[in-house]
Swiss-Prot record:
Alphabetized PANTHER family for the sequence: OS04G0344100 PROTEIN-RELATED, TERPENE SYNTHASE 10
Catalytic function, reaction form: (2E)-geranyl diphosphate + H2O = 1,8-cineole + diphosphate; (2E)-geranyl diphosphate = alpha-pinene + diphosphate; (2E)-geranyl diphosphate = beta-pinene + diphosphate; (2E)-geranyl diphosphate + H2O = (S)-alpha-terpineol + diphosphate
UniProt-annotated binding residues for Mg(2+) 2: 345, 349
Name this polypeptide is given: Cineole synthase 1, chloroplastic
Listed Pfam families: Terpene_synth, Terpene_synth_C
Outcome of substituting residue 447 to S: Lost ability to produce 1,8-cineole, alpha-pinene, beta-pinene and alpha-terpineol, but strongly increased ability to produce sabinene and slightly acquired ability to produce limonene from (2E)-geranyl diphosphate
Length: 591
């Protein structure tokens, strides 16, 4: 490794220049807000770069952050103390014994499913894989004619990457094989498991498509008549967002609430889930504090008052994407990426003139300090923050993995900025792209590729150049993850962005192209998300990338659907429901 370091030159983070940017306070932008005929809000500011030039600019109208620096730094939790770790260890041993000693095959599978939903399955991975491995090779313990057990077994095996054929459901279909048997409609628990299992389908699996349609139709009817409160709650939850599309930790609290109401609740499992939740929350708070210190030190939110100050929301995203406890470094890194993507996105979408955006793109393509000097002051600090961050991450990867990631990281950030410029040109020309033209660019402009690129280099144990090349030719798993991220984002933010005068999003592109209603367009986008998940599911079963990189790629898509599940902007506009979910995970301990 030492010889490799001698041969690779990574630009030194340009901290020597960073301090000079804070002397630009005399050039801070002066805002006065006016409305325009194009919709949205505009700000009039002066850029003092010699001669004073009046430039009309948009503003996003975003609200200030709900958590200032001092508030974030004040968070503390007793659950980071050693005594809680020791207590949890004792309960983990007890649950391991339950898994080993449970003789009922279905009860074992149900316990595994509960552990996953409670967010504590990470403590039992070896035991779970051993149990599922035995279930994969022996079917004798499960009645293949029982829909509930068959569907539960199928779903868990696929979730753990076992190759299970959809043919296990053939015995539940009618004689012609065209639909499922009508006699199943009274098996509500079985239908719920069938519905959940259907979301692990890959492209071309017709039986699972039939299963989804059949189960959905009858579960929607059961919601209106079923009197079992716990079962009804599970059905409503699944119809809102199926288990396979849900992130684990952000959902854990609500499942703990549901689990403790069940008559078959295990007190030890419940107590472990509550304690573990509070311990993880304590860890998350420490990571958030570190990310917040970095954000404060960049000065971006002070020098660029038009950008979204959302460091807490940026961190919240990471808790669903990088779920394993030991990857705190990666969560903090991802928080920084989210903050930088958000900042640069606001520069392109809201504030920069087309000429400035072209200058910024050229500077990013050249990737050197000299290019930065041609930028207006507000862009210089943005450029330098990104430049320093990427070089620092490349250095850490070289130090820890012995691999120079610099050219790959530069490529993905340049690609992101170039996609932003394409959309800026559409805006200034008043261009309305077709849905195909829009998606060709927007799955890149959503910002998922830099996230996955950085995570690839951190989460791959032994990095091979061939794998790095495959990843950065935008492998199908990257494309699927970013496509779902884009479409889910569009479903939640498109109306707000169109009101600001932005280019049409996927919903509006479809409406313009097909002369469709908004609801028809949204239904089409939902179908695109479903189709893309089938591509994702196939990649999850067959991908040559590391198991955990595949997992975080899927989690990026899941977190997008979690944030935007009610088709409103839970990030930029601080939607009250998302705000509550964020507080419950990061700040409110479980009593």
């Amino acid at each position: 490794m030492s010889s490799l370091i001698m041969q690779v030159v990574i630009p030194k983070p340009a901290k020597f220049f960073h301090n000079n940017l804070f002397s630009l306070s005399s050039k801070r932008h002066r805002f006065s807000t006016t409305t325009t005929t194009r919709g949205g809000r505009w700000a009039r500011c002066s850029l003092q770069t010699g001669n004073e030039i009046q430039t009309e600019r948009r503003t996003g109208g975003y609200q200030p952050t709900l958590w200032d620096f001092s508030t974030i730094q004040s968070f503390d939790s007793e659950y980071k103390e050693e005594k809680h770790l020791m207590r949890a260890a004792g309960m983990i041993d007890q649950v391991k014994m339950m898994l080993q000693e449970e003789v009922d095959s279905i009860r074992r599978l149900e316990l595994i499913d509960d552990l996953r939903r409670l967010g504590i399955s990470c403590h039992f991975e070896r035991e779970i894989v051993e149990i599922l491995n035995s279930k994969y090779y022996t079917n004798n313990e499960i009645d293949e004619r029982d829909l509930y057990s068959t569907a539960l077994r199928f779903r868990l095996l696929r979730q753990y990457d076992f190759s299970v054929s959809q043919e296990v459901f053939d015995c539940f279909k009618n004689a012609k094989g065209t639909d499922f048997k009508p006699s199943l409609v009274d098996d509500t628990r079985g239908l719920l498991q069938l519905y959940e299992a259907s979301f692990l389908s890959a492209q071309g699996e017709e039986t699972l498509r039939l299963a989804r349609d059949f189960a959905t139709k009858f579960l929607q009817k059961r919601v209106l008549v079923d009197k079992d409160i716990n079962l009804l709650s599970s059905i409503e939850r699944a119809l809102e967002l199926p288990t396979h599309w849900r992130v684990q930790m952000p959902n854990a609290r609500s499942f703990i609430d549901a689990y403790k109401r069940r008559p078959d609740m295990n007190p030890t499992v419940l107590e472990l889930a509550k304690l573990d939740f509070n311990m993880v929350q304590a860890q998350f708070q420490q990571e958030l504090k570190e990310a917040s210190r970095w954000w404060n030190s960049t000065g971006l939110v002070h020098e660029l008052p038009f950008v979204r100050d959302r460091i807490v929301e940026c961190y919240y995203w990471t808790t669903g994407v990088v779920e394993r406890r030991q990857h705190g470094y990666e969560r903090i890194m991802l928080t920084k990426i989210n903050a930088l993507v958000t900042t640069i996105d606001d520069v392109f979408d809201i504030y920069g003139t087309l000429e400035e955006l072209q200058l910024f793109t050229t500077a990013i393509q050249r990737w050197d300090i000299e290019s930065m000097k041609q930028l207006p002051p507000y862009m210089q600090i943005c450029y330098l923050a990104l430049f320093n961050f990427v070089n620092e991450m490349a250095y850490d990867t070289l130090r820890d993995k012995g691999f120079d990631s610099t050219p790959y990281l530069r490529k993905v950030w340049v690609g992101l900025i170039e996609s932003y410029l394409i959309e800026a040109k559409w805006y200034y020309k008043g261009h309305k792209p077709s849905l195909e033209e829009y998606m060709k660019n927007s799955w890149i402009s959503i910002g998922g590729i830099p996230i996955l690129s950085h995570l690839f280099f951190r989460l791959t144990d032994s990095i091979e150049e061939e794998a790095a090349e495959s990843m950065h030719k935008y492998h199908d798993i990257v494309r699927a993850s970013c496509t779902i991220l884009r479409l889910a984002d569009d479903m939640g933010t498109s109306l707000d962005e169109v009101e600001r005068g932005d280019v049409p999003k996927s919903v509006q592109c479809y409406m313009n192209e097909k002369n469709a209603s908004e609801e028809e367009a949204r239904e089409h986008v939902r179908s695109l998300i479903d189709q893309t998940w089938k591509m994702m599911n196939k990649e999850m079963m067959t991908s040559s990338f590391s198991k955990y990189f595949v997992e975080v790629s899927a989690n990026l898509a899941r977190m997008a659907q979690w944030i935007y599940q009610h088709e409103s902007d839970g990030f930029g506009m601080q939607h009250s429901l998302v705000n509550k979910m964020l507080r419950d995970l990061l700040f409110h301990r479980y009593e």
